[in-house]
Swiss-Prot record:
One of its GO terms (cellular component) is plasma membrane. It comes from Crocosphaera subtropica (strain ATCC 51142 / BH68) (Cyanothece sp. (strain ATCC 51142)). It is a peripheral membrane protein. Belongs to the UPF0161 family. This is Putative membrane protein insertion efficiency factor. Keywords: Cell inner membrane, Cell membrane, Membrane. It holds the Pfam family YidD. Could be involved in insertion of integral membrane proteins into the membrane. It is found in: Cell inner membrane. PANTHER family: MEMBRANE PROTEIN INSERTION EFFICIENCY FACTOR-RELATED. The keyword Membrane applies. HAMAP family: UPF0161_YidD. Coiled coil: none annotated.
Length: 74
């Protein structure tokens, strides 16, 4: 599942993203953030973090630097 999601995001970045002007308000971009989150936290939690980030990426949010949170050990 994790590899499939990563492949889909990389495909989006390579094939679809270049067709549109850059519009992400964050650094790193939402697709890069989601890739890092999936690699760091796995498919389920990484996808959730990526979805939350994408939902915040709109004109009414200031954006800025928003890195993937660190892994916390319990």
């Amino acid at each position: 599942m994790k590899k499939t999601l990563i492949l889909l995001i990389k495909g989006y970045r390579r094939l679809i993203s270049p067709l549109f002007p850059p519009s992400c308000r964050f650094q790193p971009t939402c697709s890069q953030y989601t890739l890092e989150a999936i690699e760091k936290f796995g498919a389920l939690r990484g996808s959730w973090l990526g979805l939350r980030r994408i939902l915040r990426c709109h004109p009414f949010h200031p954006g800025g630097y928003d890195p993937v949170p660190p892994v916390t050990k319990k």
